[in-house]
Amino acid sequence: MEVSGVVLRQIPCVSSGSVAGLRLVSEFSGNTRTVGFRTRRFRGIVCNNEFADKGHVNYYIEPTRCGEEKEKVKVMEKEKKALKKKAKVLKSLSKNLDMFSSIGFGLDPEAGLVGEIQTKTISEATEILVKQLEQLKAEEKILKKQRKEEKAKAKAMKKMTEMDSESSSSSESSDSDCDKGKVVDMSSLRNKAKPVLEPLQPEATVATLPRIQEDAISCKNTSEALQIALQTSTIFPSMANPGQTLKTVEAVSVVGLPLNRVEVCMGGKCKRSGGALLLDEFQRAMTGFEGSAVACKCMGKCRDGPNVRVVKETDAVMTDSVRTPSKTLCVGVGLQDVETIVTSFFDEECSREGLGSVSY
């Protein structure tokens, strides 16, 4: 039997210098034996306090990581995420396994038919529920609109009642206590030219209407012209329209008040629009005349205020012992109208000419 082999043995160094070592090589080939020696160089130099080999330096000269390794890391991370997602899906499926079996996700074909029927019924039920929800939403919208309309109506009614509360409540009381009498709008009179009533006024300025001017020219003196003008018209020429008729209501005299007086309205709007100042001005203007200026409650026409009622005693007799004073309501009276009203109703010459009994 042939045997072949190689025996290696390192020969130790003889000297400490750079001497090449010997390696014994034995070769066996059949029955013959040959021995050979080969030299080997040391990679390092043996010195004091140094390593004999510099192989440890290669540790610090290793190549850095390239981009392929980074890509591999990314791929691994993606795979981990995919595995996590699959695990979550499997976990959820395992939890809802009973529900799927009840719906009909089974291997049995009959169970599949039952599942289809169940899905149809579920879809129909969902459609019905959706329709009911839409109907409820529409009803809620209609109710909201109705509520808004009711609120708006309530607000409008509240405003109307607040505006009319003073006038309505005062008109009811004024109808029972005192009459309305004659009504004169002072604001319309101020917009038109008024003649100045003086005893020595020329004829042309007193008689403003054409017919009155013709009658006044035919008179002999100014007193006759003034009398004709006052009989055919009133002291307020803007109200001398033949088509204008105002109602006169007989009044009952108030106990404790003078028969000849000027009543100034102290209602809400009349008082705010200067009723107190108007009362003071009337009291000042009535100092030289028979009568007085007093305050009274609302007359029911505060919308056109401030208002003044002139009460003057007349010769008309209801019974043997009761006289009926005439009442005239002046609407929209200003401070500039005080002198005109006082002189028109309470001047002696005007009263003799019948100014207090003239219809407006």
From Swiss-Prot:
Molecular function via GO: 2 iron, 2 sulfur cluster binding; diacylglycerol O-acyltransferase activity; metal ion binding
Entry-linked Gene3D superfamilies: Glutaredoxin
One BP annotation, GO: triglyceride biosynthetic process
Phenotype upon gene inactivation: No visible phenotype under normal growth conditions.
Region annotation Disordered: where it falls in the sequence: 153-182
Pathway the protein takes part in: Glycerolipid metabolism; triacylglycerol biosynthesis
EC numbers for this chain: 2.3.1.20
Binding site for [2Fe-2S] cluster: 265, 270, 298, 302
UniProt superkingdom: Eukaryota
InterPro entries: Thioredoxin-like_sf
Catalytic activity of the protein: an acyl-CoA + a 1,2-diacyl-sn-glycerol = a triacyl-sn-glycerol + CoA
Record SUPFAM superfamilies: Thioredoxin-like
Function description: Involved in triacylglycerol (TAG) biosynthesis. Catalyzes the acylation of the sn-3 hydroxy group of sn-1,2-diacylglycerol using acyl-CoA. May preferentially use linolenoyl-CoA as substrate and to a lesser extent linoleoyl-CoA. May contribute to the active recycling of linoleate and linolenate into TAG when seed oil breakdown is blocked.
Protein name from the UniProt record: Diacylglycerol O-acyltransferase 3
